[in-house]
Amino acid sequence: MALFDHLKQQMAQGAEGSYTVNLSQMPVSLQQLQAMPEGALLRPEHTAALTVAVLCLYPLHKEAALQMLEYLQGPKGLSTYDKQFLQDRFRDKDYVPRSYLAGATPQNNYEPPEPYTVTVFENPYSRDQLAEGYLTLHIRSGGADSPRQIKLRKRPSTGQWFLWEQFLLSDIRPPVAADPWA
């Protein structure tokens, strides 16, 4: 292993540890999401895992997913740009968000086993803006070589963690079923 490979591996492992969230169900409505234990948004890993779950729903039920994303973003809400960005990213790659669920790989067409599990982790820089209320978590994709970021913001008055920005919809390896070279 080369020196830089070792450094990259150390950075990817994280300084503060990792958190695994087992989702008992994939929410299909805002009411269902809010009723889930994770729906209180009191832990940053819960908000991150629910973001993945909601993005998985988007190709099937766009309006319900947008309502849930509005909730996950809290006071910030979704802008017109955010909605257009989501629509553009999901044109032909609805499998991307499923790649963040444990066990989803190109070989199984990003069909993860149940129960659905999301693991997030911190790196040495995750808490650089914690004094301002921001925390950056990382999530591995079964179809990418490097983890993706999700940035959360804490609302001190309620203790809730809201989605601030996500970089989860970048391109990944296509599923075997869609890969002409497989």
Predicted regions, residues:
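Ordered hydrophobic segments in well-structured contexts
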Residues: L50-C56, T117-T119, T136-H138, Q149-K151, ...
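Proline-rich intrinsically disordered, low-complexity coils
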Residues: P27, P37, P59, P75, ...
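Core segments of small alpha/beta cavity-forming domains
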Residues: Q10-A104
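Surface-exposed, charged secondary-structure patches
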Residues: K83-G143
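Amphipathic, hydrophobic N-terminal targeting peptides for secretion and organelle import
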Residues: M1-K8
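Generic detector of ordered, mature protein regions
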Residues: H61-A64, M68, G103, P113-E114, ...
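Short beta-strand edge/turn micro-motifs at domain boundaries
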Residues: A2, R140-W181
